[in-house]
Amino acid sequence: MNHKVGFVSLGCPKALVDSERIITQLKAQGYELVPTYQDAGVVVINTCGFIDSAVQESLDTIKEAMAENGRVIVTGCLGAKADVIKNACPDVLHISGAHAYEEVVNAVHQYLPPPADPFTQLIPPQGIKLTPRHYAYLKISEGCNQKCTFCIIPTMRGKLQSYPMAQILTEAKKLKQAGVKELLVISQDTSAYGVDTRYQQVEWQGKTVNTRFYDLCEQLGELGIWVRLHYVYPYPHVDDIVPLMRDGLILPYLDIPLQHANSRILKAMKRPASSENTLLRIASWREICPDITLRSTFIVGFPGETEEEFSELLAFLKEAQLDRVGCFKYSPVEGAKANDLDNPVSEDIKEERYHRFMQVQAEISRNKLKNKIGSTQTVLIDEINDDQIIARSKSDAPEIDGLVYLPKTSGITVGSFAEVVITDSDDYDLYASLV
């Protein structure tokens, strides 16, 4: 019998971690993963359903797999809208929602029974990873308790469920032992970690620690590898993490989605609504840890956003001088409460505001990177090509931030650290030579 499974993982890093866990279980049970639809006995698709374009990509992928294979199991965020999938592809074998690991594996068993003898010994202790060997995503919780009006994640993934502290730290330790040099800490709401457990005390390596964000960062920092924080909601206790960055325990990098600067828009989004307080906190973080890199994301064209309110966002951007910024045009996600707000912004105006926003941030980024010329930086080597080496500094997360380009040199390996001198820059990337 064919025990080969095709697997497609769509969406964000959090979905990628879900895929890794499903694949680890399947491999442990003797299944073989194959890269083509034609060779697979069944195809599993982990979908994204956050915005309309992601829904369409997921549906297109399902249709493609159905056309080329015909035996498809669907899971992930879009699985929460089974009727949407069934309407587009009525013959899929099984549909489940996000982080339904056991349900997916059981569905594979149903339509493609496992081999008689599992091959658990072939699975590395850290499990199967879909990232390069030198970095890995570490998911610390599921779900979210926030009620942001532009978002439907709580509907798809439920309320906050923090993973046990010992489980997270054990996984992190195994990843380090497997050669991982950088952990990217992720969840839907990273800084809420432990709230749902009431900060339960647990034993870890002979000492008592609390199930809370600060303690988790502190313990991860003791591993002695890069630890990078993503999706950090701006709760007041986030301020307590910055000294850990200053002291070198975790990377001086904070990914903190702010979404807007105008108080009326923020209230309509159900987000923290004081840009003045945010600017004061940013100044405080930089005073405590001058090397901190601040990344954020914003939404333009939110329903009712006026030109004056958008101009306030641009003014905030110029004053905050954030290092890394992403921008999204508001997308009316089905089921989001923001869709019911008055005065939707036209697509033309959204597009125009998006480009104005990115022009302002490009200039900020260009000037910040120019100031790094002549400095010495520690970089992590990501790729070695025929004519150049591609690396990242402490300021650069994979996939979403800039890169550091080096001339091809012998003796350098992927996944190693190197000391470099910055020699040039552009809007988003740096160029360097080895020390």
From Swiss-Prot:
Q: Where would I find the Radical SAM core domain in this sequence?
A: 130-367
Q: Which biological process, per GO, is one annotated for this protein? A: tRNA modification
Which residues does [4Fe-4S] cluster 2 bind?
A: C144, C148, C151
Q: Which residues bind [4Fe-4S] cluster 1?
A: C12, C48, C77
Q: Which reaction does it catalyse?
A: L-aspartate(89)-[ribosomal protein uS12]-hydrogen + (sulfur carrier)-SH + AH2 + 2 S-adenosyl-L-methionine = 3-methylsulfanyl-L-aspartate(89)-[ribosomal protein uS12]-hydrogen + (sulfur carrier)-H + 5'-deoxyadenosine + L-methionine + A + S-adenosyl-L-homocysteine + 2 H(+)
Looking at the record, the residues that make up the TRAM domain are: 370-435
Subcellular localization is given as: Cytoplasm
**GO molecular function, one example?**
4 iron, 4 sulfur cluster binding
Any Gene Ontology CC annotation:
cytosol
Q: How is the cofactor bound?
A: Binds 2 [4Fe-4S] clusters. One cluster is coordinated with 3 cysteines and an exchangeable S-adenosyl-L-methionine.
* Family assignment from sequence similarity: Belongs to the methylthiotransferase family. RimO subfamily.
In its UniProt entry, what is this protein called?
Answer: Ribosomal protein uS12 methylthiotransferase RimO
Which species is listed as the source?
Legionella pneumophila subsp. pneumophila (strain Philadelphia 1 / ATCC 33152 / DSM 7513)
